Every structure is written in structure tokens, then in C-alpha cells.
Amino acid sequence: MSKHNSVWVLDDDKSIRWVLEKSLSRSGLSTQCFENGEDLLHRLEKERPDAIISDIRMPGINGLDLLSTVHDQYPLLPVIIMTAHSDLDSAVSSYSRGAFEYLPKPFDI
């Protein structure tokens, strides 16, 4: 159901999606990018990646709500949360909802 070594990237910022897609592709990973959580959840009904990288603050469904939904339905699917608004509450919320990892922006690729 999933492509081998596939990572889905969710961020409302086009430049972040572009940078992550280029970097992950150079590492040999198949990458699919999404602008909003609704599209990602719809696609998740049909196929599964090996991991998801998601921003927290986005219009529509935010990254933490997406994380909760994914973790409830697919508890073994790793979700990495990234945010430019890094604080202790965001980190605790991410890990308590099942995040595999928490990345404060900016980060080195």
C-alpha cells in the first residue's frame, strides 16, 4: 500500500515544501507534498507513507490535530512535527499526541 522509503510533507508554506522535497529526494526518498491537512488525510485513506513531516500552524486542520488523527488511526506511522513557533508547550503537546520527533524551525537539512 505504500511506496518504499516514502515521506509525505505537509506545510502551508510553499518554500518549505520545496526545500524539504528537494532535500529528501536527493537522499533517495520518494516525497509527496501537501498544502493542507485535509488533502493528506484523504490520500491516507488510499495509501500510506513511511513517515509524515508536518508543520503545526496551518489554516484548516492544524498539525497537532492531524497528528492526533493519524496517531489514533495508524499508531505505527511516524509523524515528525516542525514549527517556527517553538516553545515548551508545543513540544509537550506534540510528544503527548504521539509525535515521533519535534523539529523547531529553522533547522539544518
Where does each model-flagged region fall?
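A Lys-centered signature of the CheY-like receiver
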Residues: 103-105
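Active-site beta3 strand of CheY-like receiver
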Residues: 47-53
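Short amphipathic alpha-helix used as the core "switch/output" element in two-component signaling
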Residues: 39-42, 64-76, 93-96
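Receiver (REC) domain active-site loop signature in two-component systems and cognate sites
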Residues: 58
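Acidic catalytic/metal-coordinating carboxylates
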Residues: 5, 35-36, 62-65
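Two-component/phosphorelay signaling modules centered on CheY-like receiver
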Residues: 14-32
